[in-house]
Amino acid sequence: MATSAAAVQDEPATRFAKDQLKAIIERIERLEEEKKTISDDIRDVYAEAKGNGYDVKALRTIVRMRKQDANERAEQETILETYMQALGML
């Protein structure tokens, strides 16, 4: 007894998988939209900071550094200082 493709699509397990897949895709799409909105908001904050006279590049560096582990940040600062001394920049 052969089952047709239409019969397989209507099986409860297949219906569940289709519904689950659709829900996952819709969640991803919603999160992507939220991510875009947040990115736009962050860009606006940097523009506001620039308008108030702050250096945006320095702000981005500080934000990136604050995300790092303190030990990792200290190690990178030590390496940077060593390189700068070797180049006569300090």
Swiss-Prot record:
GO terms for molecular function: DNA binding. It comes from the Bacteria. InterPro entries: GapR-like (IPR018753), GapR-like_DNA-bd (IPR046367). Pfam families: GapR_DNA-bd (PF10073). Belongs to the UPF0335 family. This is UPF0335 protein RPD_1405.
